[in-house]
Amino acid sequence: MARYTGPKCKLSRREGTDLFLKSARRSLDSKCKLDSKPGQHGRTSGARTSDYGLQLREKQKLKRMYGVLEKQFRKYFAEAERRRGNTGETLIQLLESRLDNVVYRMGFGSTRAEARQLVSHRAIEVNGHTADIASLIVKAGDVITVREKAKKQGRIREALDLASSIGIPQWVEVDTNKMAGTFKSMPDRADVARDINESMVVELYSR
C-alpha cells in the first residue's frame, strides 16, 4: 500500500483532531476545519458508530499521526505484545522512538513528514553514523545530529526556531547551535498522543 500523499487537512478533519501533520507556524484552525468532515458538505451524522468502528478510528488516528502503514503498524503491535507492561503504552513508546519521530521531537523538522524526508535524504546521524532508515528505533542515550552538509538548510533552522518558541519536549535534550540532541528517555504516556485511546487499538487487534 502506498503512503498517503493527499491533503493533510483532510486526514485531520476525518479524525476530528490535530494529527500534527502540518507545521505549527500557523494555528491549525486557520488551515483546517476540524469540525467539518471531508466531502463537499461533510458527512451527516447517522446511526451510532459501532465499537468496532470506534476501535478502527483510533487505530487510523494513531497510524496517520506517526505516518506508519498497516503492515509496519502490525509489527509494532506484535512487538508491543511480546514486551512486558501495558501493550497499548508500549506500542506508543515504540512509535515515539522511531528515528523520524525523534528528529521531529528535537525540532529538526517542522512535521514528522519533513523529519522523515531529512532521514531518507541522509541528513541525519545517529551516534556519529549516517542513518537513512526512518523506522530505526532510537534508544535512551543515543545522540542525533544534523550532518554538516545539511546544516545550511534554511528549513532546519526555521524548524528549530519554531520548536524553541513552542517548547522542546523534556525527554530530549537539544543544542540548537550544534544541531544535535540526545534522546534521554521514553516520554511519559500523559505527554504524547493525548487524543488517542490506545486501549481501543489493543481491543481491535485482540478480536
From Swiss-Prot:
<keyword id="KW-0687">Ribonucleoprotein</keyword>
<dbReference type="GO" id="GO:0042274">
    <property type="term" value="P:ribosomal small subunit biogenesis"/>
</dbReference>
<protein>
    <recommendedName>
        <fullName>Small ribosomal subunit protein uS4</fullName>
    </recommendedName>
</protein>
<keyword id="KW-0694">RNA-binding</keyword>
<dbReference type="Pfam" id="PF01479">
    <property type="entry name" value="S4"/>
</dbReference>
<dbReference type="GO" id="GO:0015935">
    <property type="term" value="C:small ribosomal subunit"/>
</dbReference>
<keyword id="KW-0689">Ribosomal protein</keyword>
<comment type="subunit">
    <text>Part of the 30S ribosomal subunit. Contacts protein S5. The interaction surface between S4 and S5 is involved in control of translational fidelity.</text>
</comment>
<comment type="function">
    <text>One of the primary rRNA binding proteins, it binds directly to 16S rRNA where it nucleates assembly of the body of the 30S subunit.</text>
</comment>
<dbReference type="InterPro" id="IPR002942">
    <property type="entry name" value="S4_RNA-bd"/>
</dbReference>
<comment type="function">
    <text>With S5 and S12 plays an important role in translational accuracy.</text>
</comment>
<dbReference type="InterPro" id="IPR001912">
    <property type="entry name" value="Ribosomal_uS4_N"/>
</dbReference>
<dbReference type="InterPro" id="IPR036986">
    <property type="entry name" value="S4_RNA-bd_sf"/>
</dbReference>
<dbReference type="GO" id="GO:0006412">
    <property type="term" value="P:translation"/>
</dbReference>
<dbReference type="InterPro" id="IPR005709">
    <property type="entry name" value="Ribosomal_uS4_bac-type"/>
</dbReference>
<feature type="region of interest" description="Disordered">
    <location>
        <begin position="31"/>
        <end position="51"/>
    </location>
</feature>
<keyword id="KW-0699">rRNA-binding</keyword>
<dbReference type="GO" id="GO:0003735">
    <property type="term" value="F:structural constituent of ribosome"/>
</dbReference>
<dbReference type="InterPro" id="IPR018079">
    <property type="entry name" value="Ribosomal_uS4_CS"/>
</dbReference>
<dbReference type="Pfam" id="PF00163">
    <property type="entry name" value="Ribosomal_S4"/>
</dbReference>
<feature type="domain" description="S4 RNA-binding">
    <location>
        <begin position="97"/>
        <end position="162"/>
    </location>
</feature>
<comment type="similarity">
    <text>Belongs to the universal ribosomal protein uS4 family.</text>
</comment>
<dbReference type="InterPro" id="IPR022801">
    <property type="entry name" value="Ribosomal_uS4"/>
</dbReference>
<dbReference type="GO" id="GO:0019843">
    <property type="term" value="F:rRNA binding"/>
</dbReference>
